[in-house]
């Protein structure tokens, strides 16, 4: 696959991936991908990431059902960052039960929560 050859992975064979809601433009999350997860994402048109802590592929939504269907894939000018534009199934991207993982905003010198929990994580990950 030519796109994989053109993509610049780091020395750990990883590339950062920014995930954006296709309809709203909201940034949903950030994750890491390796060559295998990017290839699977392209092939299946569904987001697959690489979990650095678990050291394995992470099929987004495999436990929660909150999958990410790929609408478009971009890379930046250096080919070392991926942007996935997705249809977020269930409207929840974050394991905290929020739409986005970016729900804390700097307020003076403290992080302030600015987005509500849409679904209790205990109900998501039973």
From Swiss-Prot:
The keyword Amino-acid biosynthesis applies. The gene is hisI. Its EC number is 3.5.4.19. Binds 1 Mg(2+) ion per subunit. GO terms for molecular function: magnesium ion binding; phosphoribosyl-AMP cyclohydrolase activity; zinc ion binding. It is an enzyme of class 3 (hydrolase). Its main location: cytoplasm. It comes from the Bacteria. The keyword Membrane does not apply. Homodimer. Zn(2+) binds at residues 77, 94, 101. Keywords: Amino-acid biosynthesis, Cytoplasm, Histidine biosynthesis, Hydrolase, Magnesium, Metal-binding, Zinc. This is Phosphoribosyl-AMP cyclohydrolase.
